Amino acid sequence: MDILKGKRYDIMNVLWEEGRPLSAFEINDIAPELKMPTVRRCLELLLKENIIKVAGTSMNGKVYARNYTPLLSREDYLKGNAKSRKISPVEMMTALLESDGITVEEIEQLQKLLNKKRAE
């Protein structure tokens, strides 16, 4: 699996976070640091790579806009990315737990996932 870089990753993050089909206009509204020509070009590339699909159209002012939705979940992307880079689960967990931004709630979620996996 190719690693999403730069603006393509930023656009995928917007799509993953919103959890609904979005037009280029909406992506630009949500993340104004992404300029419209960049958003459109990245959407074309993501579409060509079968990472997103057109999920219908909507009116934006007086023009129709295509709405895009991810074909790849964030979880599947992260799993595939870790696998292609040969990152072990222990290395991944170590990096997560040693990061400054992890909260107690996130640690509890990780513990629940580990307990569930252990019970399988």
Task: Show where each model-derived region lies.
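Short, cationic-aromatic polyanion-contact patches
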Residues: 3-7, 23, 57-79
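Short acidic, hydrophobic short linear motifs in intrinsically disordered regions
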Residues: 21-30
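Short alpha-helical segments that sit at the start of domains
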Residues: 1-13, 84-86, 120
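Short, hydrophobic-biased segments on the C-terminal half of alpha helices
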Residues: 40-47
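Short helix-capping/hinge SLiMs at alpha-helix to coil transitions
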Residues: 15-19
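Key DNA-contact positions within bacterial/archaeal DNA-binding proteins
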Residues: 36-37
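A short, conserved structural fragment
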Residues: 47-59
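Amphipathic alpha-helical dimerization/coiled-coil segments
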Residues: 75-120
